[in-house]
């Protein structure tokens, strides 16, 4: 599997480089970084104490010409540029970027008519199994329980609520036969009035080096149920991304997520 990594100098990029180098079936063939990055020209393996001969570059076409797959955990504007390059070079994509606008999501979906793409806000096995648990719980706590989603991430995260929190909200709303767009409440401030019993609330915490904590609270009268997932490192995301690459190796064009990859549908 000839794999290139986008955002190679970032926290997730470094973890992905290490995961690819440690996988006997994978070959690192490219490492992309943003224009102007101080790491351009550095060996991609330097982050993990290995010499790979692969230099960090901002030359999209040079990298895509060598790769069969790109793993992308960057930012929406960067991912859109990567999608355009992937279309030019017929490269399959594993995308963990969050914070897309509706227009950007439409571009991604259009590209999937020609490319195999796995797009998931969270690629850990644990989170995706948790989504199934939430669907089950929502069906049984559909009356008399208020639903709130609380997430916490490191101080550098730029979007809120997290993509994973939104995935959880969509799983719960879907199980209840609702549209998340119609029932989501993002943060509360001032005099908000009494809680709408059909709403799904979101709260976001940012601080320190928290990798990612997510709790879905079902609050009833006399009891409350909390379903929580906590990430202690990004290793689970990297392993999930490689699992997604393997999944795409046997697929043609189409838009998939980790529920497809893990056979949870």
From Swiss-Prot:
Single Gene Ontology BP annotation: lysine biosynthetic process via diaminopimelate
Transmembrane segments: none
GO MF annotation list: 4-hydroxy-tetrahydrodipicolinate reductase; NAD binding; NADP binding; oxidoreductase activity, acting on CH or CH2 groups, NAD or NADP as acceptor
Top-rank lineage group of the source organism: Bacteria
A Pfam family it matches: DapB_N
Residue sites binding NAD(+) per the record: 7-12, 33, 96-98, 120-123
Residue numbers binding NADP(+): 34
Signal peptide (UniProt feature, chain positions): none
Record has Electron transport as a keyword: no
Active site: 153, 157
Record's keyword annotation contains NAD: yes
EC main group: oxidoreductase
Documented EC number(s): 1.17.1.8
Annotated binding of (S)-2,3,4,5-tetrahydrodipicolinate, by residue: 154, 163-164
Pathway the protein acts in: Amino-acid biosynthesis; L-lysine biosynthesis via DAP pathway; (S)-tetrahydrodipicolinate from L-aspartate: step 4/4
Cell compartments where the protein resides: Cytoplasm
Catalyzed reactions per annotation: (S)-2,3,4,5-tetrahydrodipicolinate + NAD(+) + H2O = (2S,4S)-4-hydroxy-2,3,4,5-tetrahydrodipicolinate + NADH + H(+); (S)-2,3,4,5-tetrahydrodipicolinate + NADP(+) + H2O = (2S,4S)-4-hydroxy-2,3,4,5-tetrahydrodipicolinate + NADPH + H(+)
Family: Belongs to the DapB family.
Name recorded for this polypeptide: 4-hydroxy-tetrahydrodipicolinate reductase
Lineage of origin: Bacteria, Pseudomonadati, Pseudomonadota, Betaproteobacteria, Burkholderiales
Protein encoded by which gene: dapB
